Amino acid sequence: MSVKQIAFGSKVGESLLNGVIKLANCVQVTLGPNGRNVLIEQSFGDPRVTKDGVTVAKHVELEDRYENLAAQLVKSVASKTADMVGDGTTTATVLARSIYSEAFKGTSAGMNSMELRAGIDHAVEIVVEKLKELSIPVKGDYQKISQVATVSANGDTEIGDMIAQAMEKVGSDGVITVEEAKSFKTELDVVPGMQFDRGYISPYFITRQDKGIAELERSYILLYDGKISSAQSLLPVLEKCAKESASLLIIAEDVEGEALRMLVVNKLRGVLKVAAVKSPGFGDRRKAMLGDIAVLTNGYVVSSEVGMRLEDVRIEDLGRADTIVIEKDNTTVIVNGPARSSVKERCDKIRSEIQEATSDYDKEKLQERLAKLSGGVAVIRVGGATEVELKERKDRVEDAMHATKAAVEEGIIPGGGTAFLRCVKPLEEVIKSAKVQERGRDFICGIDAVRKALSSPCYQIASNAGKEGGVVVAEVLKASDVNVGYDARHDQYVDMIKSGIIDPTKVARTALQNAGSVAGLLNTTEVIIAQVPEKEKPNMGGGMGGGMGGGMDF
């Protein structure tokens, strides 16, 4: 077992706070319409330029091991916020820094950290309820949807309009994906495709570590209605795909044992681009959904019920897809070109089954299948003059897309940190209440930490615009209209809703809840146990070189 470094007492809090501050200082410059770029050195390829908070956070590694632990913890919260709603990572980081900074002052003054944490949790609950009161529904209002997307894309109206058009074409519950274009132009296209709620069986199938996804281009698809555990049964189809230098997606009830090990080894060694996901649905519905995917991709379901064996699968039996994106919990299959007549026939068959269905549950599941098969996939192809510009623009499109979906779910609130400022007064009233006063100063200090932190997003947006943050916050707080806030782009105070400066309620709520959670955890941490860095062993030289690995691993 490796030796550990251990820290106790005041050193713990100071190190953790320094780590959080350093991370927040890197991320906060990207906040708002006047957010600045961050230039990131990469281990290979060109440097990366981005305004995406979670991308910046992912690249922060601090030299001090104790400080780095705090930074990693806040990074995980930023990533969790991104995973849940796709945006709000910078806001979550800034709020976490502010809440923890205020709470740390109380702990340093001898207050009970557990009571402080209880106060933080109580304040977060109150603010969440207030945000829900301020929220305005937007489902079906494509002008508001465009405004949400524009704000999240750092004010790029072209991106905002394109996402609104995509949502209008495939519906608010439809599938929208983002790809890199082969030209300078950014274009929208609706193509046949489907998304289902199953992700990769093993994280070793991931091809893009920065996004945590597996991407396959021009891929074959093997559809099997049982479990696959034998490596031998898969060998023939794998060899056929490798011979054609094609990638392969396996969709089966499960892939396990030696079959899974063989797939992972060959993927890691670069022998074959392959991934495996579990079949969507259960029982008869699983078979039906496999049939839907087969029709969409022009393949066949390999089934023992009709006498088919994996060993006998021909390349013609496999489905084909132009793009496959596999996330932790979802898989999207895209087939470019017009929908085939077989897809339309399958949709007609499902419609007739809906009419014949007697139970509401069966009708609902059939409606889901019909929507997945007939809705198609909206593909936004992002263009750029250089690879650096393309990646930066693609980051913004993905952020905007996720923020838009969040807005449809829970509505919108005044943007620019305005909604958080409208929650300051309710917290002040709570602090004055007899019930809270009875809990004592430690509990009140926790509530006050959140109250003070609520001004930090607006303060930072103003600072990034070259203004005095404290003055801007005071002006917004003075306004009697709850929708009035600071328009950093035009340097004026406006009705944020009417001006289209809006944030999804879900993004703000999630950012605050995650920030409050991590601040409470950090403030109740008394001991740090960290790895002692290993000393580099001297290079003795003169050793024999290793032999070349060879051959296929099938």
Swiss-Prot record:
Q: Does the keyword Amino-acid biosynthesis apply?
A: no
**What's the Enzyme Commission number for this chain?**
5.6.1.7
**Which domain of life does this protein belong to?**
Bacteria
**Where's it found, cell-wise?**
Cytoplasm
Membrane spanning residue stretches: none
Q: Which UniProt keywords apply?
A: ATP-binding, Chaperone, Cytoplasm, Isomerase, Nucleotide-binding
Record-listed ATP binding positions: T30, L31, G32, P33, K51, D87, G88, T89, T90, T91, G416, D503
Q: Does the keyword Phosphoprotein apply?
A: no
Q: Name one Pfam family in it.
A: Cpn60_TCP1
UniProt GO BP: protein refolding
The entry's cellular-component GO terms read: cytoplasm
Show the GO MF annotations.
Answer: ATP binding; ATP-dependent protein folding chaperone; isomerase activity; unfolded protein binding
InterPro entries (alphabetical): Chaperonin_Cpn60_CS (IPR018370), Cpn60/GroEL (IPR001844), Cpn60/GroEL/TCP-1 (IPR002423), GroEL-like_apical_dom_sf (IPR027409), GROEL-like_equatorial_sf (IPR027413), TCP-1-like_intermed_sf (IPR027410)
The reactions it catalyses are: ATP + H2O + a folded polypeptide = ADP + phosphate + an unfolded polypeptide
**Subunit structure, as described in the record:** Forms a cylinder of 14 subunits composed of two heptameric rings stacked back-to-back. Interacts with the co-chaperonin GroES.
Q: Which PANTHER family does the record associate with it?
A: 60 KDA HEAT SHOCK PROTEIN, MITOCHONDRIAL
Annotated HAMAP family: CH60
The function of this protein is: Together with its co-chaperonin GroES, plays an essential role in assisting protein folding. The GroEL-GroES system forms a nano-cage that allows encapsulation of the non-native substrate proteins and provides a physical environment optimized to promote and accelerate protein folding.
What's the family? Belongs to the chaperonin (HSP60) family.
Q: What is this protein called?
A: Chaperonin GroEL
- What species does this protein belong to? Holospora obtusa
Q: Which gene encodes it?
A: groEL
